[in-house]
C-alpha cells in the first residue's frame, strides 16, 4: 500500500456523549464542528472537528449494541481508531487480503458518504485502522 497521496484523515475518539465532549473540544480548544450526523450502518452519532489538514471524529453510540457502546463498556472513552486516506480503496483491500490482513468489513459508505474499511488491530500492531477512499 502506497502512502503517496494519502494522509491521516481523522482520529476517531469514542465518547459517552458528543455534547459533553464538545464542552472540551469546542469550548476549551476552540475547534468548530464541520459535520454532525448519524451513521446508521455503524449505529453511531458522529461529529467531525477539523484540525489543520486532519480531523477529530467524536463517536457516540446510537444504540446499546453498537461497536462504540461495546468499546466504551470494555475500555472506557478514548482513542478508538486512526483513519488514513488511500487513492484506491479497492486496490488497497486486495493488497491487504493478499498479505493476510484481517479486515472487519468490506468497503461500504460511512460518515460523509465516503467508502471505508476497518483493519483489525491484530494485523496492524494493536491499532484499529480505517482506510478511506480519497
Regions inferred by a protein language model and the residue ranges of each:
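N-terminal beta-strand motif that seeds the catalytic metal site of vicinal oxygen chelate
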Residues: 1-22, 77-86, 134
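Vicinal oxygen chelate
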Residues: 2-4, 47-48, 57, 84, ...
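Short strand-coil-strand connectors
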Residues: 16, 50-52
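Short loop/beta submotifs within extracellular cysteine-rich repeat domains
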Residues: 21, 29-32, 55-56, 64-67, ...
Amino acid at each position: 500500500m502506497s502512502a503517496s497521496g494519502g494522509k491521516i484523515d481523522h482520529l476517531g475518539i469514542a465518547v459517552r456523549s458528543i455534547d459533553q465532549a464538545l464542552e472540551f473540544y469546542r469550548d476549551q480548544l476552540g475547534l468548530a464542528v464541520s459535520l454532525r450526523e448519524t451513521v446508521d450502518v455503524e449505529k453511531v452519532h458522529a461529529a467531525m472537528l477539523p484540525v489543520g489538514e486532519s480531523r477529530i471524529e467524536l463517536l457516540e453510540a446510537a444504540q446499546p449494541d453498537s461497536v462504540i457502546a461495546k468499546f466504551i463498556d470494555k475500555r472506557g472513552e478514548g482513542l478508538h481508531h486512526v483513519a488514513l486516506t488511500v487513492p484506491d480503496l479497492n486496490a488497497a483491500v486486495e493488497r491487504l487480503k493478499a498479505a493476510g490482513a484481517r479486515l472487519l468489513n468490506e468497503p461500504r459508505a460511512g460518515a460523509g458518504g465516503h467508502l471505508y474499511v476497518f483493519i483489525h488491530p491484530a494485523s496492524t500492531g494493536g491499532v484499529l485502522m480505517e482506510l478511506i477512499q480519497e
